[in-house]
Amino acid sequence: MNPRDEAKIKFFSDTLRSRLGDNLCQLILFGSRARGDWHEGSDYDFVVILRRKKPEMIDQVRDTEVDFLNRYDELSASLVYDEREWERRRHLPIGVNIEREGIRL
């Protein structure tokens, strides 16, 4: 991963952690940015796993995506789950791919 991408991912991670605090269990980068096969215009895909998933927590994730867009003029997209939801979904095809290719932040 190049240093520019690392800085962008760190911004997203740090911003999200400051907003969600202990409610954030895991943050995983997945997709082309994690695999290293991205191209110009590729977005940054994240899985956000929360202890408790409440509307205000989802709003904090969306606010972080907007801040990312405003700062870097690039898109990020987040799948937001609570721990139980992730436990069920990680066995589905997308979850298997995320577990295999994702980078835990």
Map each language-model feature to its residues.
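Catalytic core of pol beta-like nucleotidyltransferases
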Residues: 1-26, 35-40, 50-105
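Short beta-strand->loop micro-motif that forms the acidic, two-metal-ion catalytic signature
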Residues: 45-48
